[in-house]
Curated annotation (Swiss-Prot):
GO biological process: positive regulation of cell population proliferation; positive regulation of hepatocyte growth factor receptor signaling pathway; sprouting angiogenesis
UniProt modification remark: O-glycosylated; contains chondroitin sulfate and dermatan sulfate.
UniProt feature coiled coil, ranges: none
Disulfide bonds: 28-51, 32-53, 37-54, 43-57, 65-83, 77-99
This protein's name: Endothelial cell-specific molecule 1
Record flagged with keyword Membrane: no
Amino acid sequence: MKSLLLLTTLLVPLHLGMAWSAKYAVDCPEHCDKTECRSSLRCKRTVLDDCGCCQVCAAGPGETCYRTVSGMDGVKCGPGLKCHFYSEEDDFGDEFGICKDCPYGTFGMECKETCNCQSGICDRVTGRCLDFPFFQYAAAKSPSRTSASHTERDSASGDGNAVREEIGEGNAARPSVMKWLNPR
């Protein structure tokens, strides 16, 4: 009797360990058979099902996603997206949410990878560093603020002294009709 209790005590943790490594998937086959998988050619993007056997259609941005489902299309978020779960459950008692973009600085499946780019911005799917040449070009071509020459008549934003001087001298004539400027 003691040996049966000892054997049970040793085998139960082993069985639970295998269940935890399957990511809570249900009805997974013992061995993956790709011929049993449905075609995913019509999908925009695919992900592995919870069993890790078949490619299934992935949910896109703004689409509904579920926490634990195996072999079902459109219920896991695709790469570069993460499921943001609601506090309530659906009619069947399953947790669900909406697929949203990975936060900046993360990428990949469920946004688990960290971006190692100098700018801190990378492609949310692949992790490839993103460059923004239009910002670099504009910064290289813009004149230095310190090299601009200023005259006594230049006024800063909100400084109306130069305008008051012109009005006081009588140099500024105002038209009696409102003038409309054409947009650029």
